[in-house]
UniProtKB/Swiss-Prot annotation:
Higher taxonomy: Bacteria, Pseudomonadati, Pseudomonadota, Betaproteobacteria, Burkholderiales
Binding partners and assembly: NDH-1 is composed of 14 different subunits. Subunits NuoB, C, D, E, F, and G constitute the peripheral sector of the complex.
Protein's UniProt name: NADH-quinone oxidoreductase subunit C
Keywords assigned: Cell inner membrane, Cell membrane, Membrane, NAD, Quinone, Translocase, Transport, Ubiquinone
Described function: NDH-1 shuttles electrons from NADH, via FMN and iron-sulfur (Fe-S) centers, to quinones in the respiratory chain. The immediate electron acceptor for the enzyme in this species is believed to be ubiquinone. Couples the redox reaction to proton translocation (for every two electrons transferred, four hydrogen ions are translocated across the cytoplasmic membrane), and thus conserves the redox energy in a proton gradient.
UniProt-listed Pfam families: Complex1_30kDa
Family affiliation: Belongs to the complex I 30 kDa subunit family.
Length: 202
């Protein structure tokens, strides 16, 4: 039988007590708890969140990368890349979001949590593929969505919208070939319709 969820404030206190000085920031907003930890404490904090009696987050439901470079003022002041995980305690009926920033923007690295939760395996590969975030200790960190010869990481904010290369099937060579992108860069601006009685408004 699943336990009745505790109040969000009680969960915040339980998580803060379990993590102690590993907590850099803890925010309770809209009844959702977000905990930020440093990259140095990330692996130990995640282990505590799984094993501490008041937490018992047995399941990692999601893990993704974030590029904060164009996110308001954050990109100009703080670290560029972060990893966000969503954890679930089935036995205690509670959830928490964990955020960790990569300390080096040029080579973003955080510890892998795939040894704690098997479900992190493909999530970390996806974050590596799309953002270039390296997960130290991952057994098989290789691309999962893009082609093996893909150049760059397509979810980074500085990745060109048209990409670097395109692939097509060459009927003469009877194989897939890679070529430089032939799409011309252009500004895409929505057309604004300005009519006096547009949409029935008078």
């Amino acid at each position: 039988m699943t336990a009745i969820a505790i109040r969000p404030e009680a969960l915040r206190d339980a998580v803060a007590a379990a993590l102690g000085d590993k907590v850099r920031d803890i925010v309770l907003a809209l009844d959702e708890l977000t905990v930020t930890v440093s990259a140095a404490d990330y692996l130990a904090a995640m282990q505590l969140l799984r094993d501490a009696p008041g937490c018992r987050f047995e399941q990692l439901m999601d893990l993704c990368g974030i590029d904060y470079s164009t996110y308001g003022d954050v990109g100009t002041e703080g670290p560029r890349y972060a990893v966000v995980s969503h954890l679930l305690s089935v036995s205690l009926n509670q959830r928490v979001r964990v955020k960790v920033f990569c300390p080096d923007d040029d080579f973003p690295v955080v510890a892998s949590v795939s040894g704690i939760w098997n479900s992190a395996n493909w999530y970390e590969r996806e974050a590596f593929d799309l953002y270039g975030i390296v997960f130290d200790g991952h057994d098989d960190l290789r691309r999962i969505l893009t082609d093996y010869g893909f150049i760059g990481h397509p979810f980074r904010k500085d990745f060109p919208l048209s990409g670097h290369v395109e692939m097509r099937y060459d009927t003469e060579a009877r194989r897939v070939v890679y070529e430089p992108v032939t799409i011309e860069p252009r500004e895409i601006t929505p057309r604004i319709i300005r009519e006096e009685k547009y949409g029935g408004l008078h």
